[in-house]
Amino acid sequence: MTVDAYHEIRRRALERIDGSGLDPQRDTARLIELLRATVDDYQRHAHLGETRSLADPDATVRRLLQSVTYFGPLGDLLARDDVEEIFIEGDRVTFLEAGGRLRGLDVPSSESENRQVVERLIAATDRRLDASHPVSQARILDGSARLTAVIPPVSDHLSATIRRYALRKETLASLVELGSLTRGAADFLSLAMSASTSVIVSGPPGAGKTSFLSALIAAVPSDHCVRACEEIRELHVPIVHGSYYEARPPSLDGGGEISLRQLVKATLAMRPDLIVVGEVRGGEAFELTRAVNAGCGLACTIHANSAPDALDALVNAALMAGENIPERVVRKVFGSSIDLVIHLERDIEPKDGGIRRQTMEIRALVPSLHEDFSSEPLFRRDRLGGPLEWTGSMPPTSLVRRLERALPGQVNLTQVLEGAASW
């Protein structure tokens, strides 16, 4: 069946549905009869020589049924566990498999059909996608995926990405198995999370920042209170003591919005040991200055090309709050309270073409008399695919004291950094 043939049959079927007053979601039996009648009509015209006949009419009926009542050309992709991301650009659909290979969809689709699927996914949420809200993000499929969609006039055509959340439970140990961390680095980070340190995870899009943040949360002791705030819920690590909070867009009348900054501000009054922000992008960073000043631990992700860039990006985000606080003050607050920056990178695996995600360095901030941040690499990987090694450096004295308080008497921090002793 050609793409043009499918789209013509689908157009006729939709016209019949509209004219019949049929509710496709409630009367499946009548819908199937209508779709089969539409396909039979097309076949009769084909036998008269007006067009090419369908090789498998039953398959066409099933495809139409999926388009009208389910998720159309995306249905099979959304049902697969090995698909990480789906990219929709007009009538084109590509997807990223778990191994990192990008493939094209071999099922015919059109922009109108793809948009109908996207709108159907968003309709099940409290978000909107229309002329007044041409950019939308939503947690879809019972929270198992995130949809980001843009439509004209903001974009030339429908442009959407569906990101599936990893079904596996990320832990620091699993990151060791994947080659992103060494045992020494994982043990050190586990120790850091038990001591309520403030950690930033940085990297480009797709580097695995959210998965890494999940692994850090999983290492937090169960008696610590964790408050996790996100624009769109992506983290799903079980929290024994604490909760997750999700921002809310404005309603149709423009009211009811709950921003990420408001959520972070609210959690400060809830006695957190650790505040988690899924992704820092704007004014919520200013509220984090209050959090770290209050002695709370912090864990967040931020887009950046290096660990030093991540610190600058955090300051710039805090200044976006418009509180007229001098930049030097913001830098001083973050410089004296952030403990670690973990930078991740991604590239294409040379052997099989899959995506490789690895930790490039773990840096500790050190006290500085200047406005600029000062940091020291504790673990470093010179290149993607190379070994992640302890540099021999130790964290600043204040952090060492906090970490060693959490260690059993027979183990010291040097042994942990060397990977010679777990704790």
Task: Show which residues each predicted segment covers.
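N-terminal accessory targeting/assembly segments
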Residues: 1-130, 137-140
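Residue-level signature of catalytic and energy-coupling elements of molecular machines
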Residues: 13, 86, 149, 275, ...
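P-loop NTP-binding catalytic core
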Residues: 80, 96-195
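Switch/coupling sub-region of P-loop NTPases
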Residues: 199, 215-335, 345
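The conserved Walker
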Residues: 204-206
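Conserved lysine of the Walker
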Residues: 209
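Helical/strand "switch-coupling" subdomains that flank nucleotide/phosphate-binding cores, especially
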Residues: 287-290, 333-361, 367
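NTP-binding/hydrolysis catalytic cores, primarily Walker-type P-loop NTPases
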Residues: 351-423
